[in-house]
């Protein structure tokens, strides 16, 4: 194997991206491996064609300013006139879970109205950076509720100076919410110099990709940091960002022009830092001509064989729920949840706390500042999940801390009625639910769990049991799984916030 102590793939810089090569590289077909095989393949490539994805193309000189006022991410830097050699301190997580201090180097001032320059990201290894890869963000309504999450792709992945005079992006949305977002864009357009259009769903394809190296030693750093995640967060201008994207596109996809957008998953970075074998996920947007993404992937750039698996979209959803992540309004009801309840504050550059005004900002900023948040999304496992299929209340089903239905009703103190001679009666009140099941795919799902139950669910030697009671009186056991951000939450908030 090619693995060194730090598993560094040589030659990976902004100017020259060269993955470790070998003339003996082998390719493993999509056929299932022999069950009797003792060793795992050195590389695993899982991919899936996602359904019901629709895109809005938006472009024009005011595009960045316009989107910056609508989404939760900071897309437009607030420039402060100062010496660009001035640096500030920036704490970033390390593999050991501690922090190191890196200098903050600001992005030099530029005209965001001109050129297809990419996306501004507020926080990176050395402060803000410019990227040509997608950004996970969200649209909120005026009350701060989530209309939909979205991925904003600079498109195409790479550009030459003469291609476009203005910024251009693709907004990835589920088909059931695209018309609502078109209405939001139209309502706020006013005099902004932008153009946007819904792209026919048959014109583009959306692929989920997961690349894993299962045989890596446990005591080394996950190679995706040295080779992709860290260097992609370094460019301070559009030229370096484009050069890096050119190298990545060439190395992984042989510069195939049918690749129109790439999103590098960063929401699970903390898991990647703790586990060297944790897979790196991507979202890839292609033209409709692509029938099999694995045929575009450049396996020859790696020095080991790969097992290639085409997954069904439901399998991708199961894996996503195991990580405690939602993805599009397929997983939740629009305008019913707060972004912080969905842990968007734990995702890099998904929510900005200092960008200023945007739709839904007031409640989001106040909640973040006070730290008072009573529920958060966690992964869960369900027993007898089949019972949910026939339950009309399966969306956002309440679950309680006890499996006995009668115990969900607590008795109030007896109340004396002054207008009757009858003795005082005890009334029953419904116990507050411990949480809500947001969505599931078979055994796995995601649920809002009240933070007051976190200690019992994740830190107790004898975890409590939670149950959903269906309309037929049947019980479904629901077991919360410790989320990847739990340690950070516990350190910052304590067990009862």
From Swiss-Prot:
Residues 1-27 form a transit peptide. One of its GO terms (molecular function) is transferase activity. Induction: Up-regulated during calcium shortage. The keyword Transit peptide applies. Gene3D superfamilies: 2.40.30.160, Probable tRNA modification gtpase trme, domain 1. It is found in: Mitochondrion matrix. It comes from the Eukaryota. Residues 414-433 are annotated as: Disordered. GO terms for biological process: iron-sulfur cluster assembly; protein maturation. Its main location: mitochondrion. Keywords: Mitochondrion, Transit peptide. GO terms for cellular component: mitochondrial matrix; mitochondrion. InterPro entries: TrmE/GcvT_dom1, YgfZ/GcvT, YgfZ/GcvT_CS. Present with 2960 molecules/cell in log phase SD medium. Belongs to the GcvT family. CAF17/IBA57 subfamily. Interacts with CCR4, ISA1 and ISA2. Required for lysine and glutamate prototrophy and mitochondrial genome maintenance. Has a role in the maturation of mitochondrial aconitase-type and radical-SAM Fe/S proteins biotin synthase and lipoic acid synthase. This is Iron-sulfur cluster assembly factor IBA57, mitochondrial.
